[in-house]
Structure formats: structure tokens, C-alpha cells
Amino acid sequence: MQQSKEERVHDVFEKISDKYDVMNSVISFQRHKAWRKETMRIMDVKPGSKALDVCCGTADWTIALAGAVGEQGKVVGLDFSENMLSVGKQKVEALQLKQVELLHGNAMELPFEDNTFDYVTIGFGLRNVPDYMHVLKEMTRVVKPGGKVICLETSQPTMIGFRQGYILYFKYIMPLFGKLFAKSYKEYSWLQESASTFPGMKELANMFEKAGLERVQVKPFTFGVAAMHLGMKPESK
């Protein structure tokens, strides 16, 4: 029987959890850290605020958010892979971040009341969910009026020549890196599949608006290899 997308993604991340952080650095040539840092600068996270990191994985962005909100704030990281969360919990405990809570859960059904968080993020996770729009609507639901929803994700480069090189890299070279460094050719083949079918920047910006967000900002990184999308939930009338 053919696996659903959700089942396949779950299996992938359960299997690669122990090598995920290393492979992120290898695959992006360490650029993912700079992309996240610039995204955080644009977000302008206020101390004492409350944030949710959806599809938090091994909790790197969760930890960055914890540093921004400070000890008086609160950050919740949510992921459906218990193995990925286990790696994240080790990091959080090592840093003694009491303002962080990591939860096992599904991005399609966020277990929170409406209007709970000041910031809701998803980093390199939206492409892996069964329904992009449904998850964006869930993120919009749980963010407070005036709060921000942010997605940092791979994208589709548009520059001629660079785009072709990007496609070749993701299709052939990245899975080989997976086999070499993580013994996971099959799992890293999935990552290129999910990236290649993910919406482009303009299409995702339109989805943000359809999800109920306004003042949508788009910031491409490294010639469009990745992009930040940020939208605000309208203030209550």
C-alpha cells in the first residue's frame, strides 16, 4: 500500500533525526543560519512575548526565539516527529531554557486556543505538510490580532542558469550528500521532491493573503534558493 504524504514525511524525519542538524549545514552550505538570523531581524521579536514554532524539528529556531523573548517570554515548539523532538529537548535542557516547552503534535490541528501567540513561525516545514493552506490558516488562527506569521522555506530561483544549477543540485547532488553523510539516500531524495513541488514566492504570498494575513512581506535569500514570508493578522475591529 502506498504511503500518504504525512506517513512518508513522518518516517523520513524519524530516521534522519540524529543527522538532521549536520545535514542542514552541509546541504545549505551553512546559509540556513544566516537566513534565520536575517528573518529574526525582520521579525523584531519583543522581549516578554509569546511565540509558537510549528514543525520545530530539532528546535534551532525555537531556541533562537527563546533568546529573543527572554526569560519573561514563552516559546512553544511543536513537531510530529518524536525523534526530532528528542534531539531538540537535549539542546533545550543543555541551555536550561525554562521559557521553552516542546510538544508532540500535528501542524494540521494546532492544540491551542485562537489568538494565543504574538509570533507563529514555521521553518523548512511547510513543504512537508499535507495541506499548505490549512496549516497557514491554523497558524493565522492561533496568532493574536496584530501578531505575525512567518515562514522560512526553500523556494524556486528565477535567475536563468542559476535555476538550472539549483534543480540539478537538489535532484542529484543533495541525495548523494544524504547517502555520504547520513546513510540516507532515500530520505534525502524526499527532501528534494518536496522542495521541487513547493510554491514559488509570489504564489506563497498569495496563499498568506488567502489565509487571512495582510501586509505580507517577501524576502528572498541567496538568489531565491530560500525565502521568508511574513504576514500580520488584522487587528480586531
Curated annotation (Swiss-Prot):
Protein name: Demethylmenaquinone methyltransferase
UniProt key word Phosphoprotein: no
Residues engaged in binding S-adenosyl-L-methionine: T58, D79, N106, A107
Family: Belongs to the class I-like SAM-binding methyltransferase superfamily. MenG/UbiE family.
EC primary class: transferase
Gene: menG
Keyword S-adenosyl-L-methionine attributed: yes
Enzyme Commission number(s) from the entry: 2.1.1.163
Record organism: Bacillus anthracis
Domain of life: Bacteria
Molecular function via GO: demethylmenaquinone methyltransferase activity
